[in-house]
Amino acid sequence: MPMSTSCPHQPYCEMREQTDMRFISHLTRNTFAIILAGGRGTRLKQLTDFRSKPAVPFAGKFRILDFTLSNCVNSGIRKIGVATQYKAHSLIRHIQRGWSFLDGRFDEFIQLLPAQQQIDETQWYQGTADAVYQNLHFLRRYQPDHILVVAGDHIYKMDYGRMLAHHVKHHADMTVACIDVPLDEAREFGVMGVDEQDRVIDFVEKPQNPPAIPGQPDRALASMGIYIFNTKFLFEQLERDAMTKGSNRDFGKDIIPYIVPRYRVFAHRFADSCVGSDNHRPYWRDVGTIDAYWEANMEMTKVTPELNVYDRDWPIWTYQEQIPPAKFVFDDEDRRGTAVDSLIAGGCIISGASVKRSLLFSSVNVHSWASVEDSVVLPDVDIGRHAVLKRCVIDKHCRIPEGMVIGVDPEEDRKRFHVSPKGITLVTAEMLGQGAAEGR
């Protein structure tokens, strides 16, 4: 069995200071984050026809990627590479506009790493591991002590510094963040088994019959797609995998199953590093389907949602367009501009219309006598007079005609729009015959 690579911070590991903020800041300053943001997001249907999944808007103001980027910055990790591939234009534009505040004079940066056939002129990124492998030349330039590899398409708040401290404390070669999920959902994840010290002893990617957690027959321990590696160890494993015939070039399918029986791989419980979930189960959402996306957005309309985006101690950073405040006009008995249990972004005008339990992103106009309920309306949408929207997701730039009713009759909606298994209606400008997908 190969020897485990030595931990460069072993002297620190003997100290009780391993969890204090000074120790963690030392670790985070010398950590490089690679965010994998090239996913197609095909289960989001037409919502990702012109954008990648990490670029999809969320919670009235943000993009999905903003949560991972904010976790990095708030954790003190400010050397960040974002690997992009599919339909990357809107994501790149968003990062350039909203994430230019890091200061290169202090070696802080966000570097875009588009797929560019770096290794082979006939191949783009072939898998999650290959996306990192093709950028080894870039990582070697900085020689970090640790590398954080993280997916950019989930919604959660996490202090990666705590996970780093856990990694160093256990002299790990690799650490995998994990969360317990219902057994019937575990087929969509990498599932692991651990011993009493949380050392990973088994790992299988997306199993048809996932193993349950001992003593919890209805739960499984799932990988969150968040990994910490000792840098030298990661380089060695990526180079080995690149030479392995038949590899999928994927962390979950190839890298982790290979190293688990040979090296020190530990699980890190998300509950130990999640932020702002004191009164709830740790909040983590994969919004990979229309139903999951709609449900996660609807949770934000609750009086006290599980995800706190108002926390000034752990802000979610994003691009802030220069637009005026939201406006509500008319106060007649049958024509009153109101919004209840809703998130209304800047630039919106609610003109004698009713909005309930909904999220309106920036610059949405809702005209008189229109009704919007239980819906997610993305930016720059115009909703005509007397229109009715219920349980909808409306993509950017849609113009809902006067009197149109959506979300009331599923059979009628299916003739023009996409209706999800749980009855959520997705509407895009193309479905309405309104053409181009500019500025998604």
Swiss-Prot record:
Sequence positions that bind alpha-D-glucose 1-phosphate = 125, 190, 205-206, 223
- List the SUPFAM superfamilies hit by this protein, alphabetically: Nucleotide-diphospho-sugar transferases (SSF53448), Trimeric LpxA-like enzymes (SSF51161)
Q: Please list the reactions this protein catalyses.
A: alpha-D-glucose 1-phosphate + ATP + H(+) = ADP-alpha-D-glucose + diphosphate
What metabolic or biological pathway is this protein involved in?
Answer: Glycan biosynthesis; glycogen biosynthesis
**EC number annotated for this UniProt entry:** 2.7.7.27
The entry's function note states: Involved in the biosynthesis of ADP-glucose, a building block required for the elongation reactions to produce glycogen. Catalyzes the reaction between ATP and alpha-D-glucose 1-phosphate (G1P) to produce pyrophosphate and ADP-Glc.
Q: What is this protein called?
A: Glucose-1-phosphate adenylyltransferase
